UniProtKB/Swiss-Prot annotation:
This is Early growth response protein 1-A. GO terms for cellular component: cytoplasm; nucleus. The keyword Heme does not apply. The record marks 304, 315, 319, 325, 343, 347, 371, 375, 381 as: Interaction with DNA. A zinc finger (C2H2-type) spans 306-330, 336-358, 364-386. Residues 139-169, 175-194, 286-309, 377-441 are annotated as: Disordered. Residues 381-391 have a biased composition (Basic residues). It is found in: Nucleus; Cytoplasm.
Amino acid sequence: MAVAKTEMLVSPLQISDPFSSFPHSPTMDNYPKLEEMMLLNAGGPQFLGASVPDGSGFNSTVEGAEQFDHLTADAFSEMSLSSEKALVESSYANQTTRLPSLTYTGRFSLEPATNSSNTLWPEPLFSLVSGLVGMANISPSSAPSSSPSSSSSSSSSQSPPLSCSVQSNDSSPIYSAAPTFPNSSSEIFPDHSPQPFQNASIPYPPPAYPVSKTTFQVPMIPDYLFPQQQGDVSLVSADQKPFQAMESRTQQPSLTPLSTIKAYATHTSQDLKTINSTYQSQIIKPSRMRKYPNRPSKTPPHERPYGCPVESCDRRFSRSDELTRHIRIHTGQKPFQCRICMRNFSRSDHLTTHIRTHTGEKPFACDICGRKFARSDERKRHTKIHLRQKDKKADKATPVSVASPVSSYSPSASTSYPSPVPTSYSSPVSSSYPSPVHSSFPSPTTAVTYPSVTSTFQTHGITSFPSSIMTNAFSSPMSSALSDMSLTYSPRTIEIC
């Protein structure tokens, strides 16, 4: 229930029945407008002159007319219960005939009650009008302002003759107006909903609440977003622009940020200035160092011009790009991203070789077997396998060349066998012919026997043994005959034939 603070000057004339001019209706829309209860500038003297008795506080009708000169119809039309909107009533156009002969004017303000639960704030108008009706001469200087706790003093000062300001903290009033205070509307009505505006006679748009910012994160490269994710991106408010890649899809992000490169360049230049003069004399330009890429020895660390700026790291490099790549190890920066699987890399060559796993490209082929590889180091590692196989084949070929001289000595082993064989055959020959008769010696049989024996063995064994046996067994000329036979039927002549 709202408590009304009334500051009015009431005339001595009181009305016995103040509610006679009000239509008894349960809704707010049936109450007549407050300016219809006042005398207009043209009709004010007629009502005052007809109803004021003698001895009252008014001298004449002229004085009453002058008293309301400043109250015009335009001034009353600006007044409203909520300081912003007026209740439009088309059904009470003829209610002026029911107005009382005496009217009043005044200034009042309504303040909310702390322990009130009733939301029908127009009800205090009954108690206000029932006890305070009359005529009064009000000056703007004598009318006090509203209480300091009310924040609607600026709106009440817009209509000095008669104004009304209402401030309600209830969460769901029946008749609520859009607030015009400078602060945020969410502080006055924290749980306010726009439904009461739809049920009011004159709908007003709901107060502008601060829109909470969405926390939707757009990926770095939105080329591979799914359709539902692209729809979510459109929900982002206009003031929150997504990444620049959304505007121009063809533009790809830079591999290394320019700010990072400049920071490293300035830092390395400052580091060069702080190097001692002894080291400055030994500095070699990177361009001259690149003339000897295959030299066996590297540049000593103290002669490398680009040092790592991290205090705990003593690494130095001959090239600035090597230093930039090394600093990413400390910072953890991975500016190179795969556009297919969104994986990040710290080096561009790592990204290049990684993309080949998606595309299936294998540009490096083996020169020996023709096998293809996606990376050059994989081909190098594969080539070492072929080199090891060649070394194994070379090791197997050396024992075969050593075994060939052994086979050349095989005839010497067979030389030990011919000596006993001719002795076994020579003895029967000498014993079968003990007679000294030369004509009885069977030469054909002897000739047949010896060639068969001598053909299987070497010649030097045959010639040595039979000749000595024959000379020892016979002293007759038969020895010469046997020697001649052995010479004629020697294996040498047989081999030649």
